[in-house]
Amino acid sequence: MRVEGKPYTTIWTGEDGASIKIIDQTRLPHRFEIIAISDVEAAARAIAEMWVRGAPLIGVTAAYGLALAMRADPSDANLERASAHLKATRPTAVNLQWAVDRVRRLIESAPPPQRFAAAFAEAGVIARDDIALCEAIGMHGLSLIKTIAAGKPPGAPVNVLTHCNAGWLATVDWGTATAPVYKAHDAGLAVHVYVDETRPRNQGAALTAFELGQHGVPHTVIVDNAGGHLMQHGGIDMVIVGTDRTTASGDVCNKIGTYLKALAARDNNIPFYVAAPSPSIDFSIADGVREVPIEIRSEAEVTHISGLSADGEITRVRLTPEGSRALNPAFDVTPARLVTGLITERGVIKANASALAAAFRERVAG
């Protein structure tokens, strides 16, 4: 996608062909800064401190991180150590585990001197595959938007509600939940996005609004608790969110607050779709509420907030009284019964075990 008219992906190979570069997303939307990553510690820090975030992107970053670990020390011991270190950075998103395991399986039987080149190349394949998956999700989601548009007055926009950032900044390109929106906008369809601010890190207000604006997509930022009100008054035509982990039964783990949006959508008969690339589907578990590990992040993300001051500096301030505790679960689980459909790279499917198994037979067999 584009920033100030220049094409970017969220992660790319450095000029030396043996490092990577990323966009520091903690600085957006007020600063656009690029960081070079040349070792596994930097890759792990980028994931843990959310310089990169979004399930698909942290998976790609972790794959490159494992490759960089092999450049420094291609031993079996370091392969084990680096794999565990990267997996521990963000426990909820299944893409990270999937990508690390994929690279590890490829290289563990290779002679140590060949491991870096093989791992780095495989990370590149994962990155390119992610772009293709997201674009396919965009095309399948476009059909849903077209159907809704056909039932509205000519020229009236399809109003889409989204939560957090499941855009191109959360993937390598296109995004998951935003890919259908970009495809619709590029096809000339009138589309408008209501962007949940998404406390506590405000990734909707900071990131989704930024990328939609860069692409020229009409959008409006709303506070997290406004979505239900808009649904009650006919302001929302459909909801599209992303997923950090979807279970074999169709339960969806996504950014905290997603479950409440699904409940409101069900109460108002509004379709609730989840953009779910197959690497985000975890066929090893079925009960999302009981089995998905939920990351608990720092209290400081709730008690403090960053923004742009009047003098143009990014400033951090306290919101809560000194001494007040905060609880900060990063994700929640939306039961499959509340999901209208999963928009995958293989089409829109029902959120249930049989539909998922039929669509991804090779994953179930494996």
Curated annotation (Swiss-Prot):
Catalytic activity: 5-(methylsulfanyl)-alpha-D-ribose 1-phosphate = 5-(methylsulfanyl)-D-ribulose 1-phosphate
GO-annotated biological processes: L-methionine salvage from methylthioadenosine
Active-site residues annotated for this sequence: 244
Listed pathway(s): Amino-acid biosynthesis; L-methionine biosynthesis via salvage pathway; L-methionine from S-methyl-5-thio-alpha-D-ribose 1-phosphate: step 1/6
GO MF term set: S-methyl-5-thioribose-1-phosphate isomerase activity
Known EC number: 5.3.1.23
Residues carrying the site annotation Transition state stabilizer: 164
Keywords: Amino-acid biosynthesis, Isomerase, Methionine biosynthesis
Positions bound to substrate: 53-55, 90, 203, 254-255
InterPro entries from the UniProt entry: IF-2B-related, IF-M1Pi, IF_2B-like_C, Initiation_fac_2B_a/b/d, M1Pi_N, NagB/RpiA_transferase-like
Stated role: Catalyzes the interconversion of methylthioribose-1-phosphate (MTR-1-P) into methylthioribulose-1-phosphate (MTRu-1-P).
PANTHER family with a match to the protein in the record: METHYLTHIORIBOSE-1-PHOSPHATE ISOMERASE
Family: Belongs to the eIF-2B alpha/beta/delta subunits family. MtnA subfamily.
Protein name: Methylthioribose-1-phosphate isomerase
Taxonomic source organism: Methylocella silvestris (strain DSM 15510 / CIP 108128 / LMG 27833 / NCIMB 13906 / BL2)
